[in-house]
């Protein structure tokens, strides 16, 4: 294929589960100088919900103070909370880095990802297929999708036919749900426009901004010229405004995967090794693209339906693939896998280091910079080595690498030497 493929991959949702080392009500952030919007009511699981704002825009949403905690016979740990990046924050240059710093600086103990949405915006598929025609072929039964049997469709029923603009595969309880829809159409709906998404499109050369004019009729019957903007094919925008009716807006489509917490374990289809989905896996565009392709390999897999000589439908494993996205030959296929949730004791060295790091974080005798370092090490420890909750066989396959353990212990030794230099004991 000689044509250039323009596409834009992004986070669209990121939510994590944490535990507070100290209570963090909305007044804590207000006293630090943040603008905070507190909701008058909580959620079915949490008493308190508030949003931290920056320059009037939502930054991070916090849900805390659970109704049912384990100390009172409930299901949540004491201090449990959920943190979520706002949709606008997901489109920052480094949203995961910002999220990490927020978790560390404000004393949250990271436990794991509860939901992450990864999306790709594009004009056409990698071999030039029109997304609208792909939806039409799917609804007409010319192609079929592997996995995720539940499907929901949205479109319009017109005299000359039905036109589909959105499909969703998977159920509310699925580990992964898949969506394909016309993102331009969604943003054009009143009250749904998101300028930061359109800015990303321009940076990725999916479209260009065209200033337009249109006639507006006032309440007194007089008319005036007003200005607006449309998004046209990249490089075709004119410097001067043009009438709105002469502007042909380019449709940009989106494929989106929503991954829930029970899909946090991934298996390498070649080596059969298990890997944990963490913030480290989604902190760059290239990592997001790799994860998107892994998901697409399993959850956006289509077959072209063919028939036998007798006129019966051919078995799906004998039908040819309908390839939509091109992936590198160097990329390895990973598949989400739900693992048993039975508790398994962590290795003893992890428990010892974790307990001492917690004491460092909560001790009043420890300087702030050392407590922050301890919290950072603790986050990294749980990011790389949180293995309990898997079966014995799986834990043997997904064994600790010596490098990870050595690096973490070396950081811990440096921290202990800093304490000894200050003659602090804990």
Regions found by a protein language model. Name each.
Residues 1-340, 349-426:
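Structured, helix-rich domain cores that form ligand/interaction pockets
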């Amino acid at each position: 294929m000689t044509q250039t493929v323009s596409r834009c991959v992004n986070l669209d949702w990121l939510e994590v589960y944490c535990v507070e080392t100290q209570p963090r009500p909305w007044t804590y952030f207000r006293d630090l100088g943040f603008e905070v919007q507190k909701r008058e009511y909580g959620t079915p699981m949490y008493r308190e919900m508030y949003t931290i704002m920056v320059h009037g825009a939502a930054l991070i949403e916090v849900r805390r103070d659970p109704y049912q905690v384990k100390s009172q016979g409930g299901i949540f740990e004491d201090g449990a909370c959920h943190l979520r990046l706002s949709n606008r924050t997901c489109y920052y240059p480094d949203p995961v880095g910002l999220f990490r710093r927020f978790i560390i600086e404000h004393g949250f103990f990271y436990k794991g990802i509860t939901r992450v949405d990864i999306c790709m915006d594009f004009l056409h598929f990698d071999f030039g297929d029109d997304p609208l025609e792909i939806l039409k072929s799917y609804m007409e039964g010319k192609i079929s999708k592997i996995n995720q049997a539940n499907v929901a469709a949205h479109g319009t029923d017109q005299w000359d036919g039905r036109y589909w603009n959105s499909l969703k595969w998977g159920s509310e309880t699925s580990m992964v749900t898949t969506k394909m829809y016309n993102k331009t159409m969604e943003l054009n709906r009143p009250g749904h426009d998101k300028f930061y998404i359109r800015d990303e499109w321009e940076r990725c050369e999916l479209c260009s901004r065209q200033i337009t004019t249109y006639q507006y009729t006032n309440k007194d019957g007089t008319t005036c010229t007003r200005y607006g903007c449309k998004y046209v094919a990249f490089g075709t925008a004119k410097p001067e405004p043009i009438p709105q009716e002469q502007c042909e807006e380019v449709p940009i489509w989106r494929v989106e995967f929503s991954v829930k917490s029970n899909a946090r374990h991934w298996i390498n289809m070649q080596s059969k090794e298990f890997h944990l989905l963490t913030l480290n896996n989604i902190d760059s565009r290239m990592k997001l693209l790799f994860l998107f392709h892994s998901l697409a390999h399993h959850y956006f897999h289509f077959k072209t339906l063919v028939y036998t000589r007798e006129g019966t439908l051919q078995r799906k494993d004998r039908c040819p693939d309908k390839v939509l996205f091109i992936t590198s030959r160097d990329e390895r296929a990973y598949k989400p896998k739900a693992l048993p949730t039975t508790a398994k004791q962590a290795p003893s060295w992890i428990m010892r280091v974790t307990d001492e790091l917690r004491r460092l974080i909560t001790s009043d005798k420890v300087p702030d910079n050392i407590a922050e370092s301890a919290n950072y090490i603790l986050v990294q420890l749980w990011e790389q080595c949180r293995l309990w909750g898997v079966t014995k066989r799986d834990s043997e396959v997904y064994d600790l690498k010596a490098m990870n353990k050595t690096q973490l212990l070396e950081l811990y030794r440096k921290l202990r030497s800093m304490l000894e230099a200050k003659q602090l004991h804990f």
